[in-house]
Curated annotation (Swiss-Prot):
Residues binding ATP: 375-382
Function, as annotated: Involved in lipopolysaccharide (LPS) biosynthesis. Translocates lipid A-core from the inner to the outer leaflet of the inner membrane. Transmembrane domains (TMD) form a pore in the inner membrane and the ATP-binding domain (NBD) is responsible for energy generation.
Gene3D superfamilies linked: ABC transporter type 1, transmembrane domain, P-loop containing nucleotide triphosphate hydrolases
Enzyme class: translocase
Gene name of the record: msbA
Domain ABC transporter as annotated: residue spans: 342-576
Ranges for domain ABC transmembrane type-1: 28-310
The protein's name: ATP-dependent lipid A-core flippase
Listed PROSITE patterns: ABC_TM1F, ABC_TRANSPORTER_1, ABC_TRANSPORTER_2, MSBA
Keyword tags: ATP-binding, Cell inner membrane, Cell membrane, Lipid transport, Membrane, Nucleotide-binding, Translocase, Transmembrane, Transmembrane helix, Transport
Record has Transport as a keyword: yes
Entries under InterPro entries matching the protein: AAA+_ATPase, ABC1_TM_dom, ABC1_TM_sf, ABC_transporter-like_ATP-bd, ABC_transporter-like_CS, ABC_transpr_lipidA, P-loop_NTPase, Type_1_exporter
Length: 588
């Protein structure tokens, strides 16, 4: 592990620089400005020797008269190049953050569904916001400070060597000890930084869950529990931050001690070796001034190390995410709408190499017909609906669309043929019109209104203050459950896809609304292949075929009346919902 760390750091730097490369002209200008800034500082230190020697030892009136002009020009130029360097480096950093955030977001959007099953929204937000921001500190603040201070250190050491190389060599003997201290804190800070990122993800996750589920939190009296949980996470985060601070303190104090020993050694050497080393008062004071000036950049470089390590840990987290494989998306691009014939052939499926959820599932949905999936929770209904648009890849078997295996179609082409209305409605913090037209951004206002009318949403939309331009709030919080569901149905109607997936599409509606929506859906379903998932069997009586699932296997198929005549699983489920009676032997 120890040997791999420098190699890993170099690889991270190299990969990070690939994002900086497009902005190299501005970066180069910023680097040159910072080098000039450090050169001016080192030049002022060398001028100390001339000021003393030519102003007090051997007086040079011409030089003395030039001192105010030298100081004015030097300080003015120093301020200008400092501002230029800071602006250029910040511009590069924010540009890198923008590109990296866009890349991370685009990658997350295209990750397979099983990744979302394991990762929380808080963890993902932490990567986009916190981890990428740590990378910004490496590519701007840290880089600026590093260039300025390393150039200043080199400049000051050069000044010392020019003035008196013998004393300067003595000081250089302290460098290996500084390296030992920095190397130790490098590893410690990187390790702690990974913990800091993890705790930030936990803090974001806890806050996100509590805010989104505030109704449940309040009705079940969970405020104190959530506050305690959040406080524990923030306290753990604080402790990790303090560990980083301790590492910084050890770094700074250790380096300052080494430099102090170096300065003391040089002063003693200058006193005891005065007969061997000839040096003027101005030169001696200039060397001492240079050594004292070295303390600040050396201190900055050592504290900078913690920032760099946090940034590298952030980069590692971001790049690990970017290395995750995307959804497999190689296949044919369909230019026309399909007819909509669906066939499942010997389909098996397991999540993440676990036990099979589906076992040898076989059925056909003729184009333009409706098929309903029924069964107890966990029987595999939603899994079947998720396999069709390839949210998950099959473990075994084949699903065909108009005779073509869905794996041979591009994801965009495949999903373009489908509309979805699920039990958990997703609305965006945008206008009602834009929510209905989601995925059909070229739709006219007339088309949007027509879809809303078919979904029985037009009436309540017109009663809102801004009508179709009313913003719905985060996830449609300003709408009732039934209203949100009708907007989702209007969205599916507007897409006008040949395949319609209804996952408990009427579950959030009251009886009156459900009656209207059911009538609207029957009209929309005409000529479309429709896959219906429902718990309320009264809503699927008119489906062309009903498939009964139990423990991931198909146990019955047929029309509503045919299944009732069988007096099997479906008949028992129907009796339970209609009359509250059940034959336990049949359902088990």
């Amino acid at each position: 592990m120890k040997n791999n760390l420098p190699i890993k750091s170099r690889l991270l730097y190299k990969r990070l620089l690939s994002y900086v490369k497009p902005f190299w002209p501005v970066l180069l200008l910023g680097v040159l400005a910072n080098i000039l800034y450090s050169g001016i500082d080192a030049g002022f230190t060398y001028m100390t020797k001339l000021f003393l020697d030519k102003s007090f030892i051997t007086i040079d009136l011409n030089f003395v008269k030039q001192i105010p002009l030298i100081v004015l020009i030097g300080i003015t130029l120093r301020g200008l190049v400092s501002s230029l360097g800071s602006y250029c480096m910040t511009w590069v950093a924010r540009s890198v953050v923008k590109v990296l955030r866009q890349t991370v977001f685009s990658h997350i959007i295209h990750l397979p569904a099983d990744y979302y099953d394991e990762a929380t929204s808080g963890q993902l937000l932490s990567k986009i916001l916190y981890d990428v921001e740590q990378v910004a500190q490496v590519s701007a603040d840290a880089l600026t400070d590093f260039i300025q201070n390393i150039c200043l250190v080199i400049g000051l050491l050069t000044v010392m060597m020019v003035i008196c190389w013998q004393l300067s060599l003595m000081f250089l003997l302290t460098i290996p000890f500084v390296g030992i201290i920095v190397n130790y804190t490098n590893k410690r800070v990187r390790r702690i930084s990974h913990k800091v990122q993890k705790t930030m993800g936990e803090v974001t996750e806890i806050a996100s869950e509590a805010i989104e589920g505030y109704r449940v939190v309040r009705i079940f009296g969970g405020e104190r529990y959530e506050i305690t949980k959040f406080n524990k996470a923030t306290e753990y985060s604080r402790k990790n931050d303090m560990k980083v601070a301790i590492s910084k303190a050890i770094n700074v104090s250790g380096v300052q001690l080494v430099i102090a020993i170096g300065i003391a050694t040089i002063i003693m050497a200058a006193i005891h070796l005065s007969t061997v080393i000839t040096i003027s008062a101005g030169s001696f004071l200039a060397i001492i001034a240079a050594m004292l000036q070295l303390i600040k950049p050396m201190k900055t470089l050592t504290t900078l190390n913690a920032t760099i390590q946090r940034g590298l840990a952030g980069a590692e987290s971001v790049f690990n995410l970017l290395d995750l494989p995307l959804e497999r998306n190689n296949g044919l691009i369909l230019k026309e709408k399909i007819r909509g014939e669906i066939e499942f052939k010997h389909v098996y499926h397991a999540y993440r190499q676990g036990q099979n959820i589906l076992h040898d599932v076989n059925f056909v949905i003729e184009a333009g017909t409706s098929v309903a999936l029924v069964g107890h929770s966990g029987s595999g209904k939603t899994t079947i609906a998720s396999l069709l648009p390839r949210f998950y890849e099959l473990s075994q078997g084949m699903i065909t669309l108009d005779g073509m295996p869905i794996q041979q179609l591009s994801l965009e082409s495949l999903r373009k043929q489908m509309s979805l209305v699920s039990q958990n409605v997703t609305l965006f913090n945008d206008t009602l019109a834009n929510n209905i037209a989601y995925g059909r951004f070229d739709a006219s206002r007339e088309q949007i209104i027509t879809a809303a009318k078919l979904a029985y949403a037009d009436e309540f939309i017109k009663q809102l203050p801004d009508g179709y331009d009313t913003r719905v709030g985060e996830n449609g919080v300003l709408l009732s459950g039934g209203q949100r569901q009708r907007i989702a149905i209007a969205r599916a109607i507007l897409k006008d896809a040949p395949i319609l997936i209804l996952d408990e599409a009427t579950s959030a509606l009251d009886s009156e609304s459900e009656h209207y929506i059911q009538a609207a859906l029957e009209q929309v379903m005409k000529g479309r292949t429709t896959l219906i998932i429902a718990h309320r069997l009264s809503t699927i009586k008119h489906a062309h075929k009903i498939i009964v699932l139990q423990h991931g296997r198909i146990v019955e198929q047929g029309s509503h009346q045919e299944l009732l005549d069988m007096d099997g699983h479906y008949a028992q489920l129907y009796k339970v919902q209609q009359f509250g009676r059940i034959n336990e032997e049949v359902v088990a």
